[in-house]
Structure formats: structure tokens, C-alpha cells
């Protein structure tokens, strides 16, 4: 089965090489002849010339607008924030805490940090066993 596939593949490749060498396979001459006859059939009319000039004018205008937009749009300068080691881009400053939102200062002195208690209220580490 493998020998039959190998033989058929070699046969197909040999046919492609022979046709390629004779110039009959993948001929470029036909495409160039069709293009040449289409361009010689009739000269462009005034309407086609007008639309071509309008299109070129629009393209030039768009190109000018794009270049103006690229000139106007510049990256914003970087600012350094106190408390941070490296300067941040102004566009990414939204991730930093806003100064308008101030959080309440939590008074930690009211909380008692001691030995953990269980639900009943006794110390988990009791001195008596049992």
C-alpha cells in the first residue's frame, strides 16, 4: 500500500515538472495577454477620469488628516508620585488611589490581642485537662 502511494506521488510530481518545463502549467502569459487587451480596448472616459482625480484628492486629504492627527497626539509626559519608586504614565494613574476617597482611620487600640477564645469564652489552651 505504501509502495503504491509512493509511486503515485512520484508520477504526479514528474508530470508537474514536465508541464512546468514546457510552459503549459501555470502560464503567466494568458493573464498578461488578458490584461493587455483590456487596457487597449477603450480610453478612459471623462467620468472615469473625474472619479479617479476625486479619489486621489480624497486620499491625499485623508493622508494629510492622518499626519495632522499623528502630530497632535503625543504621549503624555511621565510624572513621579511620592511614595513610589518609579514614575508612572499619566494614563495608568487611574489604578492609584484617588485622593478624594479618604478612608477612616481604624483605631487599633480598642481591639485586644490576646489568647484566642473559643465559642464559650474559655481559653483554648486551658491549664486543666479532661
Curated annotation (Swiss-Prot):
It holds the Pfam family Musclin. GO terms for molecular function: hormone activity; signaling receptor binding. InterPro entries: Osteocrin (IPR021088). It is found in: Secreted. Residues 1-25 form the signal peptide. Its main location: secreted. Keywords: Amidation, Cleavage on pair of basic residues, Developmental protein, Differentiation, Hormone, Osteogenesis, Secreted, Signal. The keyword Signal applies. Expressed in skeletal muscle and to a much lesser extent in bone, brown adipose tissue, spleen and testis. Not expressed in neurons. Induction: Is regulated by nutritional changes. Is up-regulated dose-dependently by insulin. Is down-regulated dose-dependently by forskolin. Induced in muscle following physical exercise. Disruption phenotype: Mice grow normally and do not display any visible phenotype but show reduced physical endurance. Mice do not show skeletal deformities, differences in bone density, growth abnormalities, blood pressure nor body composition changes. The modification Arginine amide is found at residue 129. GO terms for biological process: cell differentiation; cell surface receptor signaling pathway; endochondral bone growth; hormone-mediated signaling pathway; negative regulation of D-glucose import; negative regulation of dendrite extension; negative regulation of osteoblast differentiation; ossification. One of its GO terms (cellular component) is extracellular space. Belongs to the Osteocrin family. Hormone that acts as a ligand for natriuretic peptide receptor NPR3/NPR-C and promotes bone growth and physical endurance in muscle. Acts as a regulator of osteoblast differentiation and bone growth by binding to natriuretic peptide receptor NPR3/NPR-C, thereby preventing binding between NPR3/NPR-C and natriuretic peptides, leading to increase cGMP production. Required to enhance physical endurance: induced following physical exercise in muscle and promotes cGMP production, probably by interacting with NPR3/NPR-C. Interacts with NPR3. This is Osteocrin. It comes from Mus musculus. The gene is Ostn.
Amino acid at each position: 500500500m505504501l509502495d503504491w502511494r509512493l509511486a503515485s506521488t512520484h508520477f504526479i510530481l514528474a508530470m508537474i515538472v514536465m508541464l512546468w518545463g514546457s510552459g503549459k502549467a501555470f502560464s503567466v502569459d494568458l493573464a498578461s495577454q488578458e490584461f493587455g487587451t483590456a487596457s487597449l480596448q477603450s480610453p478612459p472616459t471623462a467620468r472615469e477620469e473625474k472619479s479617479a482625480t476625486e479619489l486621489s484628492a480624497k486620499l491625499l486629504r485623508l493622508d494629510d488628516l492622518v499626519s495632522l492627527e499623528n502630530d497632535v497626539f503625543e504621549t503624555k509626559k511621565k510624572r513621579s508620585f511620592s511614595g513610589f519608586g518609579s514614575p508612572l504614565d499619566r494614563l495608568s494613574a487611574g489604578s492609584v488611589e484617588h485622593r478624594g476617597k479618604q478612608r477612616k482611620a481604624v483605631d487599633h487600640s480598642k481591639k485586644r490581642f490576646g489568647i484566642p477564645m473559643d465559642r464559650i469564652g474559655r481559653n483554648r489552651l486551658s491549664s486543666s485537662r479532661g
